[in-house]
Amino acid sequence: MIKQRTLKQSIKVTGVGLHSGNKVTLTLRPAMPNTGVVYYRTDLNPAVAFPADPNSVRDTMLCTALINDQGVRISTVEHLNAALAGLGIDNIIIEVDAPEIPIMDGSASPFIYLLLDAGIEEQNAAKKFIRIKEYVRVEDGDKWAEFKPYNGFRLDFTIDFDHPAIGKDVRNYEMNFSAQAFVHQISRARTFGFMKDIEYLQSQGLALGGSLDNAIVLDDYRILNEDGLRFKDELVRHKMLDAIGDLYMAGYNIIGDFKAYKSGHGLNNKLLRAVLANQEAWEFVTFEDKEQVPQGYVAPAQVLI
């Protein structure tokens, strides 16, 4: 049986909020089977819970933000959520003493190391997957994202920025998902932004924690980071990282073929909602026999690095 996963023990880290620029403490805790992924704002009394749910994603302008019916929010969840998807963590309590998850280095890599440091434990309950059964597509102008049936999790993402530092040869990335592929090919890709946009955001009191330490920054001509890129196509890899995190808002790893062109947090969420709203388009599956599991989901998360 392919089993659900949680952490072996709790672990804590301190970082900076991307938008506030303030110190943020993040605590990750084990959770019982079938708990799912639950975010908590512990700076509020009583603490406010945000179960991972695509319908709770109500702001996707600058990040993925969960907002409840009272207007309480928790922002910038996508990189941590991507790390959870990458390692197949089904059940976890995520506590944060601020309105946003710390940005760390702008990638999912620090969260991967944090989760592996806490240790991953299998639980005595069958892991549920969402299997795509029918073609689903959403569009927004020339942007689009789609799912097709596929026995695995395949991703194909294309970006299109008219910028001299983003050539045609670094605008597409394709990958067959596995924990190893995510850790080595995707998790280290950092978020990116354009200097003119960052200056405007900071003038509006946003992105105050943004810096060359936690983002790739481009001016009109080049990349400003002294150390350059971690991959020549780091930007499109990061957009794939974002998509993996956004799609894991379903709370389950997905079996299907995802393809996107110029998609962002909003369209990723729209696709996920469109899939789940169509009962014919998907089903829950579990696997009693490891031989039947799609290739990318076979390897245990403990053998990663």
UniProtKB/Swiss-Prot annotation:
Q: Which cofactor does it need?
A: Zn(2+)
Which UniProt keyword terms apply here?
Answer: Hydrolase, Lipid A biosynthesis, Lipid biosynthesis, Lipid metabolism, Metal-binding, Zinc
Catalytic activity field: a UDP-3-O-[(3R)-3-hydroxyacyl]-N-acetyl-alpha-D-glucosamine + H2O = a UDP-3-O-[(3R)-3-hydroxyacyl]-alpha-D-glucosamine + acetate
Pathway listed:
Glycolipid biosynthesis; lipid IV(A) biosynthesis; lipid IV(A) from (3R)-3-hydroxytetradecanoyl-[acyl-carrier-protein] and UDP-N-acetyl-alpha-D-glucosamine: step 2/6
User: Is Hydrolase one of the keywords?
Assistant: yes
Q: Which SUPFAM superfamilies match?
A: Ribosomal protein S5 domain 2-like
Active site (UniProt): 265 (proton donor)
GO CC, one annotated term: membrane
Q: Which GO terms describe its molecular function?
A: metal ion binding; UDP-3-O-acyl-N-acetylglucosamine deacetylase activity
- What processes in GO biological process is this protein linked to? lipid A biosynthetic process
The highest taxon in the source lineage is: Bacteria
Q: Which residues bind Zn(2+)?
A: 79, 238, 242
EC number(s) for this protein? Answer: 3.5.1.108
Which parts pass through the membrane?
A: none
Q: Which family does it belong to?
A: Belongs to the LpxC family.
Described by its record, this protein's role is as follows: Catalyzes the hydrolysis of UDP-3-O-myristoyl-N-acetylglucosamine to form UDP-3-O-myristoylglucosamine and acetate, the committed step in lipid A biosynthesis.
Q: What is this protein called?
A: UDP-3-O-acyl-N-acetylglucosamine deacetylase
Identify the species of origin.
Haemophilus influenzae (strain 86-028NP)
